[in-house]
Curated annotation (Swiss-Prot):
Protein's name according to its UniProt entry: RWD domain-containing protein 3
Assembly information from the UniProt record: Interacts with UBE2I/UBC9, NFKBIA, HIF1A and NCOA2.
Comment block on domains: The RWD domain is required for the sumoylation enhancement activity.
Record keywords: Cytoplasm, Nucleus
Subcellular location, principal: nucleus
InterPro entries found in the cross-reference section: RWD_dom, RWDD3, UBQ-conjugating_enzyme/RWD
Localization of this protein: Nucleus; Cytoplasm
Gene Ontology cellular-component annotations: cytoplasm; nucleus
Length: 267
């Protein structure tokens, strides 16, 4: 992790030092840093709207965009998505320099304006920069592995909900103890999905207490290629044999991905 990023994290922890304002969720040399900032901003009628801003600073940050998630019990999902899109637009203007504090200040000062816009504004209507300028043009695909899923019914419902809200397609795949999630869609939405999965209490620990997902691995992340099948929906599927799972990947033009990332997990 770059020294300037370490300094930024230290500064953020000092700035947001009030009760429950700052929460570091994970930090590593390989996956970057994931943290939450709890703050407030002025709403449509001057009321204080509590905001939960989750950020993922990947290893390449600040030369690449951070992952951003906006949640609030006082806002609709569409309003949260619009706020996230606006923040990503501001982030594109600040690439190559530490930006998190600037982004928090921006949403604090501009939430009222964001909320005054129609809720129909969403991630398929981005206009801040041409897509080709972001380097993320076209759909992306990410393959994830979960170590376990104790509260399976609740967990599956959460995954389906996030995929639907973020317009992601793909598969949640079970084969014995192997659990894989294959996602296709807008890269910023996949990043937000990862933040939600890492910061939400979707499972339970061995004592039955609600807990966050700490054992998720990103096996692959790449642009969807012409030979790859585009999934039309997000589905939950179970496979009784390795051959069935391999056929699923092969039918989607992902035989190489299966050989490189999945086969070794079950041998």
């Amino acid at each position: 992790m770059a020294e300037e990023v370490r300094q930024e994290l230290s500064a953020l922890a000092a700035i947001f030092c009030g009760p429950n304002e700052w929460e570091m969720l994970s930090c590593s040399e390989t996956d970057g840093a994931v943290f939450r900032i709890h703050t407030t901003a002025e709403g449509l009628v001057g009321e204080d709207v509590p905001l939960e801003l989750a950020f993922h600073l990947p290893v390449g940050y600040p030369l690449c965009l951070p992952g951003i998630s906006v949640t609030s019990e006082h806002l609709t999902r569409a309003q949260c998505v619009t706020a996230k899109e606006k923040l990503l637009g501001e982030a594109r203007k600040l690439v190559s320099e530490p930006m998190v504090h600037e982004l928090v200040l921006w949403i604090q000062q501009n939430l009222r304006l964001v909320l005054s816009q129609p809720e129909t504004v969403s991630s398929h209507e981005k206009c801040t920069l041409p897509e080709s300028a972001t380097g993320d043009d076209g759909p992306w695909m990410t393959l994830l592995r979960l170590d376990h899923m104790r509260a399976r019914t609740k967990y599956v419902k959460a995954v389906e909900k996030w995929a639907s809200e973020l317009r992601l397609t793909g598969r949640l795949m079970f084969m014995g103890k192997l659990i894989l999630i294959l996602l296709q869609g807008d890269r910023s939405n996949i990043k937000e999905y990862l933040i939600l999965q890492k910061t939400s209490k979707v499972d339970v620990d061995s004592s039955g207490k609600k807990c966050k997902e700490k054992m998720i691995s990103v096996l692959s992340e790449t642009k969807v290629q012409t030979e790859h099948k585009r999934f039309l929906a997000f589905e939950v599927k179970e496979y009784s044999t390795l051959e069935e799972l391999q056929k699923e990947f092969g039918a989607a033009g992902l035989g190489e991905l299966f050989s490189e990332c999945v086969l070794g997990l079950v041998k």
